[in-house]
Amino acid sequence: IRTENIEKNTHDNPFGAVLSFRGTVTDTTLSHPLAATVIELTDTFPVPDAKAFGVGQWWTVQVAPVEGGGRDERELQKLVEITEIVDATHVRIGYLNGWELAAGRTLTWTRVEPVRNSHVRNMVFEGAGPDEYTGSHPVSFEYAVGCDVSGIHATGTFWPVVMRRWCTRFRTEDCSLKNPPTVEYGGAGYLTQQIYCLYGRVADCTTSNVRHLNDLTASAYCTVVNCHGDGDDAGGNPFTTHGQYEHDLLFDGNSGLMDIANSGAQWGISAKRLTVRRHVCSWFVANTKITDLTLEDVTVIARPTFDQAGTLTVNADGAQVRGCTAKTFAVAQRSARSTRPTTVSDCSFDLPAGGVLVQTPVTAPVHFVRCTFTGVDGAVLRGAGPVRLTDCTVTGAEDAAPLSVGSADLTIDGGRYENTGIELSAVRDQRITVTGGVRLTGRNRAGALLGRAAGPGKVTWDLTGLSSTTDTATAHVRIADGTNHYLATGNRFTGGTLHLVPGALASALHTACVEDGTKRVAMPDDGTTARTEGNLIL
């Protein structure tokens, strides 16, 4: 299909497609405030009078915007089927609600006669002009149920090749888009966009030089499988969600830049239970109000033509990051809705010098398990929340600065740290626990494998089962500033020095340690607040 000299479209109208399918919106509308909370994952909704509804009817249902939030910030906007009249004031719908709705929020129901089972297949489409008026695109669906698209291969379309809004149960498969006229105009240059959609599958699609391959906006229970976007250097990211309270989405086996829930506060920058598996890209950002994000086998490879940092960023709100690889990794926090921990396990990161690993706003606990960090030079863990590193391997760059840690509670349990170290920022009261056979080796620019800055915070040190080996110019532990409570039992120090300034120690217990060729540069005398006997000095 070619569309030269096609009739001009109207302003901002992505539904002005060559093939446009639109259901009928009736005049039947009901609005009512909720008398009680509508819980998450329910399919039973209160209504003023269930007699107004019939089983098998289709209705749009939406909640009023969040009070004090963005203009379009709504947790619920879906096209749903009435599946049962429960009682005089409740109906059951074909959708399990993704977000709790508080009492007092207003729901609006509108009856719709949707387009049903209209399919478009096997089309080669060439777009027309370069703007919203002269451009063209193949197909749009609005208020549609069970309408599938397959085998559309488009070039140069302005609006999305497949545009959907208020759609339920659909497939978009084996479609492609190359070289739209713009990737800078919002809403244009997409292969497919879904707004207020349910139960969709996008599969086996490809794009080149587009804004988005797939955009899911205020949608739920959808999958995106085996889709691949290249030419994503010039302003487009193939995979995105709008951040309008999307939930329960799966991305599996795709490639291309990914940016989740990041269209702006107007829509809420929120999403929940998004899972990304076996994904390859050079930039992956998910640092807005994304709750219970799951990443498995995501590989981010730095590319000189786009993000040379190879960035992967997540929100510390129930994120589970497993088996992932990136150059730059950062944990942010914009929300605190989850009940599950934020855990990063079996991952590999090659951190840039001075990079912030845990950002300032992070107050949630963050747990790194069996992770490998290379090229570390002054990486910063700035947030106040607890940080735990279990069996991690951290390798510093040449003449590297130690990790700078602001966490109020840092636990290092096992693992190996080579040519790096820990310096507590002491911007607040802090506790550091080193246990589980941690091995520290090498040296760093600060001249201390474990130390603290001269901040105002009180630091509590608990070192047990540590093995530390270094040269004569480097301290295993250096405590020279502030107020400190120090405990070291059952540790092995080889070479190096111990620098424990008495005036900086409110209490000290250093016992049952092996000091093999280690010089005590400073050490408190035994007394009521200090005990240093019972060590093996070799």
Summary of predicted features, one role per range:
Residues I1-R2, H119-R121, C147-G151, F170-D174, ...:
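All-beta strand scaffolds that present successive hydrophobic residues in beta-strands
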Residues G129-H137, T157-M163, P180-L191, G200, ...:
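Short glycine/acidic-rich loop motifs that flank beta-strands on beta-rich extracellular proteins
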Residues E4-G94, E100:
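Autoprocessing Asn-cyclization modules and mimics
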